[in-house]
Amino acid sequence: MEKKVLVTGASGFIGSFLVEGGLERGMLTWAGIRKTSSRKYLQDKRIRFAELNFGDKEKLKEQLTGHKQEHGGWDYIIHCAGVTKCLHQEDFDKGNYQATVNFVEALKELEMVPERFMYISSLSIFGPIHEESYEPISEKDEAKPNTAYGVSKLKSEK
């Protein structure tokens, strides 16, 4: 039986490559996108699409329920969706942290928790670490984000 994977943020740079990776591995691959997302880099006919609204938990639950009824759940979810540019700092929190909370809570409430859930964060969580020494960042380094984006991504990891 083929494994099923959902890549959220699939219209983005990293997400589009992860969709390709799922297809190359023979997985049934869903591209999780917003209704308004570009499909420019998602042209392969094998890609299945899931329109997801992370900003509205009830709408998201409706969308996930529809998917569950038609296809079941996913074996793997790679969560890349998020915002990188906002007019107001608090919008980073809504678009990254609250959206991730909505997604995880909806999956739990609908009993759609996958075998594996991977959250894609950002180097921005570390802030200006090792700027002068150019040493590699390690898991032991302390995260000290200095942007609203970095703070929202770090908060989403927890």
Give the positions of each predicted feature.
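N-terminal Rossmann-fold cofactor-binding loop
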Residues: G32-S37, N53-F54
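Short loop/helix-cap segments at secondary-structure boundaries that form the rim of catalytic
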Residues: S38-K45
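Conserved Rossmann-fold NAD(P)-dependent oxidoreductase catalytic core, especially the SDR/UDP-sugar
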Residues: H79, V101-A148
